[in-house]
């Protein structure tokens, strides 16, 4: 069976390839301590990469708090966000429209890197939970190969606007948003 790189890598646009390569370099620079926590947090958020603070080295098992051993020790990926703590990746789906090939890749990535659940957002986007920071560039490349990006999927940017699919012709709408 062919690996994803053999099938999809030549389909990534030069612009997306460069953006992902730069982000991967920023991850390495952060790991080496050459990028400030706050700056890296802003950088990763623009790429749809969230740190999940609730899991910073501790997990409550229902009876007591358990300490989790993270191999990277005290390295942070943002203020108060441990490097190895599971994160979340938001995926931008303009117009909420997907092709079958894109759905296959989204499903495969959910099984391979997340908890097997592809979360649908109120803004017609998707989220993967329990993603390790180091896996994000590979996930981004696979998404880019089918025309999907995480760029500006979060933060103070314009995202999908959700409206009624029959706006303008719906007889009981309060106002026409079309």
Where are these regions (language model features)?
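Iron-sulfur (Fe-S) cluster-binding modules
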Residues: 1-89, 105
């Amino acid at each position: 069976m062919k690996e994803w790189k053999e099938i999809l890598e030549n389909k990534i646009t030069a612009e997306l390839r460069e953006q992902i390569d730069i982000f991967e370099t920023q991850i390495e620079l952060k790991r080496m301590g050459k990028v400030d926590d706050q700056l890296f947090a802003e950088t990763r958020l623009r790429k749809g990469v969230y740190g999940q603070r609730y899991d910073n080295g501790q997990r409550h098992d229902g009876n007591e708090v358990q300490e989790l051993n993270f191999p990277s020790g005290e390295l942070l990926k943002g203020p108060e966000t441990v490097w190895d703590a599971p994160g979340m990746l938001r995926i931008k789906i303009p117009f909420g429209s997907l092709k079958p090939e894109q759905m296959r890749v989204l499903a495969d990535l959910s099984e391979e890197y997340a908890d097997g659940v592809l979360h649908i957002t109120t803004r017609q986007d998707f989220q993967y939970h329990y993603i390790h920071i180091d896996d994000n560039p590979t996930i981004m490349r696979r998404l880019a190969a089918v025309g999907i990006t995480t760029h500006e999927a979060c933060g103070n940017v314009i995202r999908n606007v959700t409206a009624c699919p029959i706006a303008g012709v719906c007889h009981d709408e309060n106002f026409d948003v079309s």
